[in-house]
Amino acid sequence: MSEQDARSVTGIRDKDYNLIWFVEASLSNALRLEGYISDADMDGDAELADFFRRAQAVSRKGGDLGKAMLAARLKKEE
């Protein structure tokens, strides 16, 4: 949803909406990948488990970077 769309629905422009969404999506993806890793491990598929672990690390990094950026932006507003 674009800022214009969100504004027309809620009447409020949220400049941080996309960043908050990104953090939530990244960390949710990292959590979801935990199940995929477990499944691959149980199936004895080390290659797939390793692939999911690498993808999970990237998702966590994105979440961490997004959290840091959001914290810095919110602190500026104080």
For the regions a language model picked out, list residue spans one by one.
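Iron-associated oxidoreductase/ferritin-like identity signal
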Residues: 1-78
